[in-house]
C-alpha cells in the first residue's frame, strides 16, 4: 500500500472535500474511484455513518482501492462498472437520492506507472492497449491498424484537437502497410516524424484522443451527467474535476442545459493553487466545477 500512496496524489483534495459539503450520515458517490485518494478523505468525513458508493471500471484498481478504504471504515460499497450506470446502482441499493457525487475525470497515475497498457508515451515498450477495462474489446492498436485515414484524422482533431491531424493520419495509414502498430514506440516513431517539438510533448494530444475513443469517455460522461438531476437530493452537490477542454466543454454544457434544476455554486471555475501544481504536476490542467440541486 505504501507504493500506492507514492504514485497517487488526489488532485485538489481540500477543495473537493469542501465543495462536496460532507457530514456524517450522507450518501456520497465517488464516480471515479481510482485508487481511492478522494474516497479515503470522504470516508473520514462521514465518520462511520452514511454510505460511500465507489465506482470504477478497472477491476485491478478497484481491488487496490478496497484494501485502502478498509483501513479507514466499512461504510462503503464498490461497483466494478462504468459510472453511467449510477442510476442502476442506486436502484440495486434501493436508494432514490444521493447527497453528493464526485467525478474526477483524470486517469489514475496507476495507469501510467503500473498498468502496462500503453497509456503513456514515456513507456515505449508497452503495448498500444489503453483500455481501462478488459471487458472493452477495442484497443489503441486496433484503431491505428483499422480506421481509415478520414476516421483517424477526425479522431485526432475532435478528441485531441491536434492541428496536424490530417498529416498524422496519412502517415499512419502509409506506415501500417509496411508494419502494424503494436507498441507505443511504433506510434511515437510516426508522431516524431510528423509533429515538431512543442512545449508539451508532441504525442500528448494523440494519446489523449486514442484513450478517449478506446474507453468511450465522452459518451459515458454525457450519459452519466444526464442522470444527475434525477438522483441528486435537493441542495445536493455535484463536483467535477476536468483536465482538458473536450471534457470541460461537456460539463459546461451540462450545467447550462440543466440550469433550471442545478445552479453553479461558483461563477468562475476553480483552479489548483500554485503550491499544489508545484507538488503534483497532474494538477496543472485541472478545473473544478461545482453545482447544487435546486430545492
Swiss-Prot record:
Gene3D superfamilies: Putative methyltransferase TM0872, insert domain, Vaccinia Virus protein VP39. Keywords: Cytoplasm, Methyltransferase, rRNA processing, S-adenosyl-L-methionine, Transferase. It is found in: Cytoplasm. GO terms for biological process: rRNA base methylation. One of its GO terms (cellular component) is cytoplasm. S-adenosyl-L-methionine binds at residues 36-38, 56, 90, 104, 111. SUPFAM superfamilies: Putative methyltransferase TM0872, insert domain (SSF81799), S-adenosyl-L-methionine-dependent methyltransferases (SSF53335). Pfam families: Methyltransf_5. One of its GO terms (molecular function) is rRNA (cytosine-N4-)-methyltransferase activity. Its main location: cytoplasm. It catalyses: cytidine(1402) in 16S rRNA + S-adenosyl-L-methionine = N(4)-methylcytidine(1402) in 16S rRNA + S-adenosyl-L-homocysteine + H(+). InterPro entries: RsmH (IPR002903), SAM-dep_MeTrfase_MraW_recog (IPR023397), SAM-dependent_MTases_sf (IPR029063). Its EC number is 2.1.1.199. PANTHER family: 12S RRNA N4-METHYLCYTIDINE METHYLTRANSFERASE, S-ADENOSYL-METHYLTRANSFERASE MRAW. Belongs to the methyltransferase superfamily. RsmH family. Specifically methylates the N4 position of cytidine in position 1402 (C1402) of 16S rRNA. This is Ribosomal RNA small subunit methyltransferase H. It comes from Dictyoglomus turgidum (strain DSM 6724 / Z-1310). The gene is rsmH.
